[in-house]
Structure formats: structure tokens, C-alpha cells
Design a protein with these regions (language model features):
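Bacterial N-terminal signal peptides
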Residues: 14-22
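N-terminal secretory signal peptides that target proteins for export/translocation
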Residues: 1-7
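A "functional boundary" signal
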Residues: 9, 24-336
Length: 338
């Protein structure tokens, strides 16, 4: 894993240099958009504290690790599973290598407990994190290998399994972006999300799942309505869920050609990601793209796209970096008119 990390760190620096150069080529002198200063101020205040938020997260992780190391000999296997799950959750959107490590630990502990619920929960986490790192085949292989006995599993375990599996197919469709496979991946993702609905009790999650299905069916207005309901009902202290809802609202508004609303939600999502020390995210890249293509703000766009590259390289997000690589010719053609 470390060799892969070094390779992608080098890729990050090379891409950063190229993209900065491209962004400044042929810069036009368009007027700043109406609320530019408000966007810049919100982002600047958050970015100034970015290192502080990361240190706070690492301190929290250290406290969990210290607790585990101090008490591990007198813990039950179920207690060990829970603490390792807490560490997995802390790293899930912060560092791929560390999250992968704790996912494998969960699988090991689950095999000792010898419980189908614990094993499904552990393998679901492993499959999910493999996709976050861009290892889609390995993710699908892992999730497909899970034996589901609906009558023997708790509702939460079943819901997490179907939602995670569905999200992997949706992410693969977004990464593939073609006219042949993407539609099939989206269909499979929707089928899995639909399977989760009978096991959900939280109204916000129900709205999120239904909204995601509507989005993948290109029912944008319906998706927007459902995501707004999910936002109104969600626990705002759950930074991961909040980021998903905000960034998806931005994406929906972008596709509805409501640029100002899209930027509004991308800013809220990006600030939330910074405050929660989230490295695996699309909000910063989405904001940079909106500012560059729709507001012609090269300066802010270049700053935020570099933040996105830095986070992707830190996390080890292979598919995010690959997507950025495919965008480079687009930037070149746009700026040089070729």
C-alpha cells in the first residue's frame, strides 16, 4: 500500500503543477460574480483552520488507540470489534490505508466471534473501503461473496449492506461514464438501494435512499425534493451524512443549471469536509469546477482544485486522481481553444 501511496503523491505534485499552469493560461478579465467575496471568506476561514481540525482528529484517534492498547487484554471479542469499528470509522474518509487495515482487523475479529451479523458487518465495511480507494473489482468481489440470510440478520446490518453495495455500483457508474456499462451499474445500484428500504427506520435515510434512486433515474426535481427532506431531517452532527447530502444537492442543482445554488451547497459541503478533516470527498473539486467554468474565477478555482488534489493524494484515492488525469486534456483544450 505504501508504494502505491508514494506513486500517487508524485502524481499529485505533477498534476498540481500542470493544472496551475493551465488555469492561468489565457486568463480573461471577466468581472467577479456577485457573491465572490462571501464564498472566498467562508472558504478562507475554514482552510486557515484545516491543520487544526486534522490535529484534533488525530488526537481523538490516538485516544481511541490508547484505550484499545490499555484495555485489550480484558476486552471481549465483541468489545474489540466495536473499538476497531470506531477506528475504522475515524479513518474511513481520512486515510485509505489505515481504514483498510482496520477493516481487515474487523474481519479477523468477526471470524473469532463466529457470528453471521458480525461477519456481514465486517465484510461490508471492507467492500465499502475498497471502493473508496478506487479498487472497484476487489470491492465488488468482496461484497458479492457475502452470504445474506435475511431472517438471521439485524435490520441495520442488512440496510448497511444493501446501501454500501448500491453505492459501490453507483460510484463505478460515475467513474466509467459511458453509454454501455454505466446505465447497467446504475440499475444494479438502484436495485440494491431498493432492497434496503424495508430495513430502514430513520426518515432522513429513507429520503436519502429514495433521492439517490431518483437521481440515478435522472428525475432531478424529485431527487432534489427528497434530498432537501433528508437534509431537513438529518443529524447535523453526522458529518459524513451531511457531506453526502450537501454535495449531492450541489450536483443536482448543477445539472438543473442552477449555478448559484450549486455553488452555495458545494461551499457548505466543502466547509463541512474541512471541519471534519474529511479527505475523501468531491465537494472541493466540484466547487472549483463550478467557479472555473461557470464564474470564470481562475484564482479561487486554482486554489480549491489544488486542495482537492492534495486531499486525494493524502487519502490514496486512486480513482479520484485518475479522473483528474482525464480532465487535464479538457482544461488544455478549453484554455488554448484546441
Amino acid at each position: 500500500m505504501q508504494e502505491h501511496r508514494q506513486k500517487y503523491v508524485w502524481s499529485f505534485w505533477i498534476i498540481s503543477i500542470i493544472i496551475i499552469s493551465i488555469l492561468y493560461i489565457g486568463c480573461t478579465n471577466g468581472n467577479p460574480f456577485q457573491y465572490r467575496e462571501d464564498v472566498a471568506k467562508q472558504m478562507s476561514l475554514a482552510l486557515q483552520q484545516k491543520d487544526v481540525y486534522c490535529r484534533e482528529k488525530l488526537n481523538h484517534i490516538d485516544s481511541i488507540r490508547n484505550f484499545l492498547n490499555t484495555n485489550i487484554k480484558r476486552m471481549t471479542d465483541e468489545e474489540k470489534f466495536q473499538v476497531n469499528a470506531n477506528l475504522y470509522n475515524e479513518f474511513k474518509l481520512y486515510s485509505f490505508d489505515s481504514a483498510f487495515h482496520y477493516a481487515t482487523q474487523l474481519c479477523r475479529i468477526a471470524s473469532v466471534i463466529d457470528s453471521s451479523a458480525y461477519m456481514v458487518s465486517a465484510k461490508t465495511r471492507l467492500g465499502y473501503i475498497l471502493a473508496r480507494g478506487g479498487l472497484f473489482k476487489e470491492s465488488l468481489d468482496s461484497l458479492s461473496s457475502i452470504q445474506i440470510e435475511k431472517d438471521a440478520l439485524p435490520a441495520k446490518v442488512l440496510a448497511d449492506y444493501y446501501i454500501s453495495f448500491g453505492r459501490v455500483y453507483h460510484d463505478l457508474a460515475d467513474y466509467t461514464k459511458d453509454d454501455v456499462f454505466s446505465s447497467r451499474y446504475n440499475q444494479l445500484g438502484n436495485e440494491l438501494l431498493t432492497e434496503s428500504l424495508p430495513y430502514l427506520s430513520d426518515s432522513s435515510t429513507v429520503c436519502y435512499v429514495k433521492g439517490k434512486i431518483a437521481l440515478k433515474e435522472n428525475k432531478l426535481e424529485r431527487a432534489k425534493q427528497l434530498y432537501q427532506q433528508a437534509l431537513n431531517l438529518c443529524d447535523t452532527t453526522d458529518s459524513e451524512t451531511l457531506s453526502i447530502l450537501l454535495s449531492t444537492m450541489a450536483y443536482i442543482n448543477r445539472n438543473l443549471e442552477l449555478d448559484d445554488e450549486a455553488i452555495h451547497y458545494y461551499v457548505k459541503a466543502a466547509v463541512n469536509d474541512i471541519r471534519s478533516a474529511t479527505k475523501e470527498s468531491v465537494s472541493m473539486r466540484g466547487l472549483a469546477t463550478m467557479l472555473y467554468y461557470h464564474k470564470n474565477d481562475v484564482n479561487l478555482a486554482s486554489e480549491y482544485i489544488n486542495e482537492a488534489f492534495e486531499d486525494a493524494a493524502f487519502y490514496g484515492t486512486r480513482h479520484r486522481i485518475n479522473v483528474i488525469g482525464t480532465l487535464l486534456p479538457v482544461f488544455v483544450g478549453e484554455k488554448l481553444d484546441i
